[in-house]
Amino acid sequence: MDDGMAAQPAMGQPQVGDVAASSDAFPVAGAGDLPVVAPTSRIATWVRLIRPAALLLVLVPALTALALLWLRGARIMALPALAGLISLTMVQAGASLLDVYLEYARRARLPDAERHDQLTARALLAHSRVQPLTVLPVSIALLMLGALAGIPLLVSGGWPVALLGIAGLAIAFLFSATAFALKRFSLADLLIGLALGPGIVTGMMLAQRHAPTTRDLLLSGALGLLAMLPAEGAHLRDADQDKALGRRTLVTTLGDGVGRAIYVLFLLAGFTLLAFAALPKGAPHGALVGFFALPAFSIPLTGVLRARPGRAREQIVPQELRAYAVFGFWLLLGLAINAILISGLGPIPPTV
C-alpha cells in the first residue's frame, strides 16, 4: 500500500511518526514515517530522534570509498576505516539531535495550523517523555565524541584529513545552530552535496593514504547530489513554514515550480555522474547496478511533481530516504560483485 494512503488522524489529534522526517537538516533531512504512535520506551524515543535512516547519508559514501580502494587492490587499514565509520555515525547522530532540538524550539513559536509536522522528529520530541532540554547536551556530547573518534584518521591521513574533518564538524554544527544558521540560506544545500559526497569519500581515501581519482570524485558527486534530494523535498514540503521563519531556501526564493525543477535536475545529474564514473573502460562497472534504484526514486519524484505544498508532501522526505537506502544497497552490492569477479584478473588501475 502506498504511504500516501495512510489514514489521517482525527482533527486535533497529534500524529507522531518516525524520527527522521524533520524538515531540513544537514544532519540532515531526516527519514522515516513508520508510524504514528510515540514509543513508550525512552530508549526507543532516543533512537528515533537520531534519525537512523539519515545515518546512511554518511555511511554509504564512506563504505563506497573503501569499496573503490578494494577494487584497486589497495590494502585497507582497519583502524582508520573503523574509526571513520564510528566518527561519521556519531557526528551525524549528534547533528540530528541538535537539529531536532533547535527546530522544536524555533517552531514552537508558530501557530499549530502552520506547523504541518506530524511526521517529524520534532513532533516526536514534543509528544514524548524526553525532556527537550536534555537533547541539547546529548547532541553536543555526541559531536565531541565523534570528533575524538576521528583522531586515528588524522594520524593516518595528516593535515588534509584534519582540514576536512574540521570543515565537516563545523558544517554539522553551524547548519542548525546560531542565529545565522547555514540552513537559512539558499545555497546551503550545496554544502550537503559537498559534505555527503566528495568530502566523505576524499577524507576516507586520504586516511587510507590514497588520493581519489577523477572517477572516484564523479561517483562521490553522484552520492552528494542524491543526498541533497531529501533536503530539497523538505523545502518543497515546508515552504510556508520556512517563509514564516524567514528562511531563504531555493523554494521560498525562486518559487515552487523552480524548486521542483531543481529537484528533478539534481536527480538526473546524480545518475548522469554515476554513468560517467562507471561506464568508461577500466571503470568500476559494478557501480552501474545502482541504476536498479531508479524505481524507488520514482515514488518521491511523483510526489514532488504532483502533490501540493504542505501536508500532501509529507511523505516525500521519508520516501526519498528509502530510495537512497535502496541506491546505497545496490551500489555497494555492485562494487562488491565487481571486486569479487575481477579478483583473479588483477585490480582496476587507479587511473582516470
Where are these regions (language model features)?
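Small-residue-rich segments of transmembrane alpha-helices in multi-pass membrane proteins
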Residues: 56-65, 190-205, 252-256, 318-331
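Membrane-embedded alpha-helical segments that form the functional core of polytopic membrane enzymes
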Residues: 63, 73-104, 162-173, 213-233
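Extended hydrophobic alpha-helices typical of membrane-associated regions
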Residues: 279-346, 352
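Intramembrane alpha-helical segments
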Residues: 122-211
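Acidic (Asp/Glu-rich) catalytic motifs at the cytosolic membrane interface
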Residues: 90-116, 228-251
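Multi-pass membrane catalytic core of lipid/isoprenoid biosynthesis enzymes
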Residues: 112-155, 251-282, 325-327
